[in-house]
Regions:
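The feature marks the mature, well-folded catalytic cores of soluble enzymes
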Residues: 1-185
Length: 185
């Protein structure tokens, strides 16, 4: 991941109306807590990084009532502002789709510049048939019903929590921006 990829990703997310919050991995639970509305559901595999108020073993009723779904993304595609959401037994895909707000947790190190790089990452998973992945780009929008409608086939809002590795914070200490976030690795 380069500074250019990070900058491009953030610019594309902004173009799509997606909010981005950045911070170190150690602050993940706090950042998610600030981004998530009530009630919130999430997937168990990210439980160590989620605030206690996020239900990590949601029932169907919990999912129906949830305002926010919190998932991890396996990959981010900078050129499109897309995130790779895995369809797994933990329920990542439904938690990302059946809510008004989807909070996506993505490690900065998991950003790639473009789709050829994303397909290179996806190739072994597809060949092994070990993974189903959806590339999601921004909030749900459709014009199937006449005018543009948001939230008909997925979340109305998307919020990305972009996490830096702790080592990157130390390496970039002299390259901080005005808001105190590291400018690159």
């Amino acid at each position: 991941m380069s500074l250019a990829d990070r900058t491009t990703f953030k610019r594309r997310l902004d173009d799509l109306g997606v909010t981005v919050t950045e911070g170190p991995r150690s602050a993940c639970a706090e950042l998610v807590d600030e981004a998530a509305g009530e009630p919130a559901v999430g997937v168990a595999r990210a439980a160590a990084e989620l605030p206690d108020r996020v239900e990590t073993e949601p029932t169907t009723a919990d999912l129906r009532e949830a305002h926010t779904g919190v998932t991890a993304a396996e990959l981010g595609v900078a050129a499109y502002g897309s995130v790779a959401i895995e369809a797994d037994r933990a329920g990542t895909e439904p938690v990302s789709l059946f809510v008004d707000r989807h909070v996506v947790v993505l490690r900065e190190a998991d950003l790639v510049p473009d789709m050829p790089d994303a397909f290179e990452w996806l190739g072994p998973r597809a060949r092994d048939e070990s993974s189903d992945v959806v590339f999601a780009t921004g909030p749900s929008a459709t014009a199937d019903m006449g005018g543009l409608v948001h939230g008909a086939h997925g979340p109305k809002e998307v919020h990305v929590v972009l996490l830096r590795d702790e080592e990157a914070d130390g390496d970039a200490a002299g390259e901080s921006g005005a808001d105190g976030d590291a400018a690159g690795e």
